[in-house]
């Protein structure tokens, strides 16, 4: 009787051990399946199975290949994992004709479409935000292209040409405004940071100062952001209404003199610089 109970108990323990091992194995597999990563799927208009698509980075206006995918059954797929969000390009070229779209490489499912009239990357937060801005810009570009083509009509009167030029200028302002609004809406994410670094010079000092204060801590030491901070601080220091910056120079006879030696001594101080 005792032997039977011992044997039964031993078999039960073995079953529990097997179940525990199986549970651990399933847990490991589950963790591996849940590991953060990206899957990029897309199509290219006019491409054939066997053609090559690349993920590339752009450095000093030059493309550098980072990954390769072969088109199969009309689609291409990239898989990998990112520990940070970066701007990259998906490119395709054949017989001298190429098409590309820049996007934000980040973990998640990203869908890409490359065609003559539609270049898009969507599916993740940063790419959706970027595509929203791109759609607005593309619409403006199309209107500008139509005006540019219409300007070639030799039958247009001077008044009609002036009207077209005015419309074109208004679209340029709309383009800048679309970028500005995109930056303001996304300044706390990689999309807004990238566009801000590209367009800050079009902003007022006040606008740049306000945007810089909203940039997340992990971007505060970015090389370009640091430069923009420096430029903005210098602009603030020399803005109208600010106290003058004192400096010292030598007179023609070699005597050192400061601006403060003259400011406040009369009604007006004129400082003339020449090279």
Range-by-range predicted roles:
Residues 226-264:
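N-terminal "domain-start" segment that seeds a small globular fold
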Residues 63-64, 243, 267:
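Short, small/polar residue-rich loop motifs at catalytic or cofactor-binding pockets
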Residues 85, 98, 119, 161, ...:
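N-terminal targeting signals for export/organelle localization
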Residues 1-43:
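Bacterial Sec-dependent N-terminal signal peptides
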Residues 267-275:
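Conserved redox-active cysteine motifs that mediate thiol-disulfide chemistry
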Residues 31-177:
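A non-transmembrane, solvent-exposed segment enriched in polar/low-complexity residues
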Residues 27, 245, 269:
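Conserved Rossmann-like nucleotide-binding pocket used by diverse enzymes
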Residues 195, 247, 271:
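Conserved hydrophobic/aromatic pocket- or pore-lining residues that grip, position, or stack substrates
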């Amino acid at each position: 009787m005792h032997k039977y109970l011992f044997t039964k108990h031993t078999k039960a323990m073995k079953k529990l051990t097997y179940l525990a091992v199986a549970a651990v194995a399933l847990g490991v597999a589950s963790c591996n399946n849940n590991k953060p990563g990206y899957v990029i799927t897309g199509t290219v208009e006019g491409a054939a199975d066997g053609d090559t698509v690349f993920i590339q980075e752009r450095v000093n206006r030059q493309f550098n290949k980072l990954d390769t995918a072969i088109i199969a059954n009309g689609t291409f797929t990239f898989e990998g994992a990112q520990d940070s969000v970066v701007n990259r390009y998906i490119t395709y070229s054949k017989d001298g004709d190429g098409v590309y779209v820049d996007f934000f490489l980040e973990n998640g499912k990203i869908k890409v479409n490359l065609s003559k009239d539609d270049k898009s990357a969507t599916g993740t937060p940063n790419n959706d935000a970027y595509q929203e801005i791109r759609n607005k810009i593309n619409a403006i570009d199309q209107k500008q292209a139509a005006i540019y083509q219409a300007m070639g009509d030799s039958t247009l009167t001077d008044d009609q040409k002036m009207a077209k030029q005015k419309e074109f200028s208004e679209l340029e302002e709309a383009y800048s405004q679309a970028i500005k609004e995109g930056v303001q809406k996304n300044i706390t994410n990689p999309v807004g940071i990238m566009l801000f670094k590209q367009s800050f010079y079009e902003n007022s000092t006040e606008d740049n100062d306000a945007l810089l204060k909203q940039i997340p801590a992990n971007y505060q030491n970015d090389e370009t952001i640091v430069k923009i901070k420096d430029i903005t601080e210098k602009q603030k220091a020399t803005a109208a209404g600010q106290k003058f910056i004192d400096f010292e120079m030598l007179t023609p006879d070699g005597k050192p003199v400061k601006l403060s030696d003259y400011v406040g001594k009369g009604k007006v101080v004129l400082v003339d610089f020449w090279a």
